[in-house]
């Protein structure tokens, strides 16, 4: 990871805190993982504050596979089974079956329809009947231990929402270049500068959580 590119966002702790503040303000953040892992950056928004414009940005600027990161508890509440019984994906990404809001959508694929689906899923009293399956939103089940258990964007998203004091659910999508290739750190930082979004790493969140745990002990 090129720390020189990230240094403009401060120390690892400062990067996390800037990210938390951005989420509280309803802005997006960009989270990168290790070069030895996926070596990608995800555009992440709070699910509870998500707007149609932000969803449109994710569809336009990212891979198009917009994912809704959920806690174990929320996944169980919604009765969402995993997409496959035996997960053979390289990083054990926790995809459940895809979803669509049962009411308030047309084809389900527009930015507004996908936001409606997200809001239906994260509602406090949401129940399985509120969602149809399959759909155009891809839920991801986060590991209970967060980034301390799995160093993934799913867990990073839920951890950041929790640390920010928001509904723990968030949406993410992998940032891509105009030619369809995956954005790497230089492009991720450039995108962050253009759209006033903090850039941080999964490692930053891991270290932040470890420091918080030490202070609490």
Curated annotation (Swiss-Prot):
<feature type="binding site">
    <location>
        <begin position="150"/>
        <end position="154"/>
    </location>
    <ligand>
        <name>D-ribulose 5-phosphate</name>
    </ligand>
</feature>
<comment type="similarity">
    <text>Belongs to the DHBP synthase family.</text>
</comment>
<comment type="function">
    <text>Catalyzes the conversion of D-ribulose 5-phosphate to formate and 3,4-dihydroxy-2-butanone 4-phosphate.</text>
</comment>
<dbReference type="GO" id="GO:0008686">
    <property type="term" value="F:3,4-dihydroxy-2-butanone-4-phosphate synthase activity"/>
</dbReference>
<dbReference type="InterPro" id="IPR000422">
    <property type="entry name" value="DHBP_synthase_RibB"/>
</dbReference>
<protein>
    <recommendedName>
        <fullName>3,4-dihydroxy-2-butanone 4-phosphate synthase</fullName>
        <ecNumber>4.1.99.12</ecNumber>
    </recommendedName>
</protein>
<keyword id="KW-0456">Lyase</keyword>
<dbReference type="Pfam" id="PF00926">
    <property type="entry name" value="DHBP_synthase"/>
</dbReference>
<feature type="binding site">
    <location>
        <position position="153"/>
    </location>
    <ligand>
        <name>Mg(2+) 2</name>
    </ligand>
</feature>
<keyword id="KW-0460">Magnesium</keyword>
<feature type="binding site">
    <location>
        <begin position="37"/>
        <end position="38"/>
    </location>
    <ligand>
        <name>D-ribulose 5-phosphate</name>
    </ligand>
</feature>
<keyword id="KW-0479">Metal-binding</keyword>
<dbReference type="GO" id="GO:0030145">
    <property type="term" value="F:manganese ion binding"/>
</dbReference>
<feature type="binding site">
    <location>
        <position position="38"/>
    </location>
    <ligand>
        <name>Mg(2+) 2</name>
    </ligand>
</feature>
<feature type="binding site">
    <location>
        <position position="42"/>
    </location>
    <ligand>
        <name>D-ribulose 5-phosphate</name>
    </ligand>
</feature>
<feature type="site" description="Essential for catalytic activity">
    <location>
        <position position="136"/>
    </location>
</feature>
<comment type="pathway">
    <text>Cofactor biosynthesis; riboflavin biosynthesis; 2-hydroxy-3-oxobutyl phosphate from D-ribulose 5-phosphate: step 1/1.</text>
</comment>
<dbReference type="GO" id="GO:0005829">
    <property type="term" value="C:cytosol"/>
</dbReference>
<feature type="site" description="Essential for catalytic activity">
    <location>
        <position position="174"/>
    </location>
</feature>
<dbReference type="InterPro" id="IPR017945">
    <property type="entry name" value="DHBP_synth_RibB-like_a/b_dom"/>
</dbReference>
<dbReference type="GO" id="GO:0009231">
    <property type="term" value="P:riboflavin biosynthetic process"/>
</dbReference>
<keyword id="KW-0686">Riboflavin biosynthesis</keyword>
<keyword id="KW-0464">Manganese</keyword>
<feature type="binding site">
    <location>
        <position position="38"/>
    </location>
    <ligand>
        <name>Mg(2+) 1</name>
    </ligand>
</feature>
<feature type="binding site">
    <location>
        <position position="174"/>
    </location>
    <ligand>
        <name>D-ribulose 5-phosphate</name>
    </ligand>
</feature>
<comment type="subunit">
    <text>Homodimer.</text>
</comment>
<dbReference type="GO" id="GO:0000287">
    <property type="term" value="F:magnesium ion binding"/>
</dbReference>
